[in-house]
Amino acid sequence: MWLETRRANRVNRLELAILSSGFVIRLLFGAIEMKIELSPWIILCSGLLALMIAVGKRRSDLEQLSTQNSVTRRSLRGYSLEFLDQVNTLLASVTIMSYLLFSTSTYALNSIGNGVLWTAPFVIFSILRYLQLVSVNKQGDDPTSMLLGDNITIILFSIWLILFTSIIALIILATTIFVFKN
């Protein structure tokens, strides 16, 4: 990424913050381009998810290098597998809480309705599945292939997407019917 510099790669946590902030910046520019107002909770969730994926990738890098008994990346020197597992557990917890807070926020209630909370179990199970793939199955080296190649993740995401879009469609339908009746 263009913000990742040699110096940032030497400071491990700074490197992760810069990497994950790139995803948030793209989200913000996309929202500006599409003229969509984003909830602060969605921005926070996106940043936390990006950070979680970056930590999982670094965990995989460290695990692969530990078998070679050499650390080629300076940024990996400040990490251990245990530390990265703890960070990912913390990030997963905070991400889930952020999504739950989004689901019950006035922004979500006013724009989408209270049905968003019904999507939360699929978010929780998806995050738990990600942690399982990274920590147990040791598949964090290529996050995109890992997530797109895992049938359980695809099913969970599909159910979440169908449920979320159905909630929005029902809100639009109910609003349209209400407008025509009045």
State the predicted function of each range.
Residues 17-19:
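A mobile, often basic/glycine-rich helix-loop segment
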Residues 6-11, 24-182:
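C-terminal membrane-associated helical module and adjoining short loops/tails
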Residues 14:
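Catalytic beta-strand/loop signature of glycosyltransferases that borders the donor
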